[in-house]
């Protein structure tokens, strides 16, 4: 009798285990503020391929894909970075403030060129060649729904992204945090709700405090390396210039998120993918940008680079004193020896002019 009872118990236990939902793992790989620094794309390609071999992957970008490297910024339509992203199979991206640097027509063409959706909930296209973008996408992985809602900063001058007023004519931007709050209803349509933002860490934290339905905020704009939890919401960011890739591991069982964790992975840890390495070398094969434009007698750190820039500004303008905002100096150092046209461009990739 005891053997029969034990046998029935084991059968019931096996049946219950068979009915229990299995744990599913999805990896979200994220980049932000690449700023045209495509030299690490071959390493990123290796990292993405290795991850896809072992898990279901979603690959996303949080804006500012260009402005910072002459080999991209001087190319037609800033295509090199977009071609690399298309080839790598990004799943979704949002706009950063520097996406608008190229002008609205070029940006509209760039969005059309992307083989992945570019989304933004708080940009309203009223009289612009830029189309009205979708506010969100819902992606399926492992039979589960992942909703991504996006917003760009409107916290610059005149309630638009940082940049000159003229490049935003015909566009209107609603408050990013308030707009993202309006999409909390998507919680009913997905297992994981993600805000893909280019608003900076201050406003990401505000969003986490105000919109508790979000599970995850993948941010950009403030160029920080962030891995923190604010009011139960995981906030992440990878810094800038594609030195790191963000790895968010989502573990699901049934309708429940069992765990959500993030780590930053240095791309220097990976060997370059030869196909992407060849693509990057092709983009960098621009003889005009390699021409000598000057010479440095000593290596300059960022302060030294800023002084060189300001001396040129002072001389060109004929002024007694020159000022420039520190964040606009985009080279942290210059090495002793020849300076190329590319080096000069990279000092200030915003195409500023002095009259």
Please annotate each region the language model reported.
Residues 6-10, 18-23, 35, 51-54, ...:
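Non-catalytic terminal accessory segments
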Residues 19-277, 302-312, 322:
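Acidic, metal/ion-coordinating pockets
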Residues 1-4:
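Positively charged n-region of N-terminal signal peptides that target proteins for export
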């Amino acid at each position: 009798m005891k053997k029969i009872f034990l046998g029935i118990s084991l059968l019931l236990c096996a049946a219950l285990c068979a009915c229990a939902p299995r744990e599913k793992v999805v990896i979200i790989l994220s980049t932000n503020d690449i700023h045209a620094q495509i030299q690490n794309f071959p390493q990123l390609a290796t990292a993405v391929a290795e991850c896809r071999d072992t898990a279901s992957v979603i690959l996303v970008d949080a804006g500012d894909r260009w402005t910072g490297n002459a080999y991209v910024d001087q190319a037609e339509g800033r295509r090199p970075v977009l071609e690399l992203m298309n080839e790598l199979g990004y799943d979704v991206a949002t706009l950063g403030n520097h996406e608008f640097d190229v002008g609205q027509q070029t940006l509209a063409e760039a969005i059309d060129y992307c083989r992945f959706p570019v989304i933004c909930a708080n940009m309203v296209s009223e009289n612009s060649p830029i189309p009205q973008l979708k506010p969100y996408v819902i992606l399926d992985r492992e039979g589960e729904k992942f909703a991504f809602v996006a917003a760009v900063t409107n916290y610059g001058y005149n309630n638009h992204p940082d940049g000159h007023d003229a490049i935003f004519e015909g566009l209107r931007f609603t408050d990013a945090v308030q707009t993202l709050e309006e999409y909390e209803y998507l919680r009913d349509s997905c297992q994981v709700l993600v805000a893909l933002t280019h608003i900076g860490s201050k406003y990401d934290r505000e969003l986490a405090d105000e919109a508790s339905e979000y599970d995850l905020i993948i941010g950009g704009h403030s160029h920080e390396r962030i891995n923190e939890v604010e009011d139960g919401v995981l906030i992440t960011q990878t810094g800038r210039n594609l030195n790191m890739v963000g790895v968010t591991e989502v573990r699901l069982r049934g309708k429940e998120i069992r765990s959500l964790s993030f780590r930053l992975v240095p791309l220097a840890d990976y060997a370059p993918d030869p196909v992407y390495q060849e693509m990057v070398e092709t983009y960098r094969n621009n003889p005009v940008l390699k021409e000598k434009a000057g010479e440095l007698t000593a290596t300059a750190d960022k302060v030294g680079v800023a002084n060189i820039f300001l001396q040129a500004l002072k001389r060109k303008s004929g002024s007694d004193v020159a000022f420039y905002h520190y964040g606009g100096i985009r080279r942290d150092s210059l090495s002793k020896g020849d300076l190329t046209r590319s080096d000069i461009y990279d000092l200030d990739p915003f195409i500023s002019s002095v009259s």
